[in-house]
C-alpha cells in the first residue's frame, strides 16, 4: 500500500489544490493531507483556522476515490525539528508531495522521498491570489470548490478577512 503526504497551508483550499489531489489519487492508495501552520489564524496570510480548513477540505473531497486523512500540523519554532514533529502527528507515509521549497528541503534532509506535483494554473490559482480577491471584494468563488464557498459563508469569512485587513 502506498500512502502519500500532501502538505499545504490551504488558505483557502482552492481548485488548484483539488486538481493536485485528484492527480495524487491516481498515484497513491491513501492520502494524508497535512494542514501547515495550523496554529496560526486571523491574520492576513492565515485568515482561516485549522478547523475551518479541515471542514473546507473534507467537504470538497467528499467522493474522492481513495481514503484520506486531514491532519492539522502546527508550526514549530525550529525548522530542523519539524519533520520529526510531522511524523509524530500523521500515519506512516512513503512519499511527501509539496511545492514549498522549505518543506522539500526539510524532508529531503531527513531522507524522505519528496515529489513536487505539477501546479494547476498557478498564476490565478494560488492562495495569495484568491485571498487578495476576497479582501478586495472581487469575484473569488470560481477559484474554489463550491463546498469551500459554503464554508466561507457559514463562518462569515469574507467579513472576517475584510475586518482584519483594516489598519487602525
Curated annotation (Swiss-Prot):
GO terms for cellular component: cytoplasm. It is found in: Cytoplasm. Keywords: ATP-binding, Cytoplasm, NAD, Nucleotide-binding, Nucleotidyltransferase, Pyridine nucleotide biosynthesis, Transferase. It comes from the Archaea. Its EC number is 2.7.7.1. It catalyses: beta-nicotinamide D-ribonucleotide + ATP + H(+) = diphosphate + NAD(+). Pfam families: CTP_transf_like (PF01467). Its main location: cytoplasm. Belongs to the archaeal NMN adenylyltransferase family. NCBIfam families: arch_NMN_Atrans, cyt_tran_rel, PRK01153.1. This is Nicotinamide-nucleotide adenylyltransferase. It comes from Methanocorpusculum labreanum (strain ATCC 43576 / DSM 4855 / Z).
Amino acid at each position: 500500500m502506498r500512502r502519500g503526504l500532501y502538505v499545504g497551508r490551504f488558505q483557502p483550499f482552492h481548485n488548484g489544490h483539488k486538481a493536485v489531489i485528484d492527480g495524487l489519487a491516481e498515484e497513491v492508495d491513501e492520502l494524508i493531507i497535512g494542514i501547515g501552520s495550523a496554529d496560526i489564524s486571523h491574520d492576513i496570510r492565515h485568515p482561516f483556522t485549522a478547523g475551518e480548513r479541515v471542514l473546507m477540505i473534507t467537504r470538497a473531497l467528499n467522493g474522492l476515490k481513495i481514503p484520506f486523512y486531514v491532519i492539522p500540523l502546527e508550526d514549530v519554532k525550529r525548522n530542523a525539528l519539524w519533520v520529526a514533529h510531522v511524523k509524530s502527528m500523521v500515519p506512516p507515509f512513503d512519499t511527501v508531495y509539496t511545492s514549498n521549497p522549505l518543506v522539500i528541503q526539510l524532508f529531503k534532509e531527513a531522507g524522505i522521498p519528496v515529489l513536487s506535483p505539477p501546479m494547476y494554473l498557478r498564476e490565478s490559482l494560488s492562495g495569495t491570489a484568491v485571498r487578495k480577491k476576497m479582501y478586495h471584494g472581487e469575484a473569488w468563488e470560481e477559484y474554489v470548490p463550491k463546498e469551500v464557498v459554503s464554508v466561507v459563508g457559514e463562518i462569515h469569512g469574507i467579513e472576517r478577512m475584510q475586518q482584519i485587513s483594516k489598519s487602525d
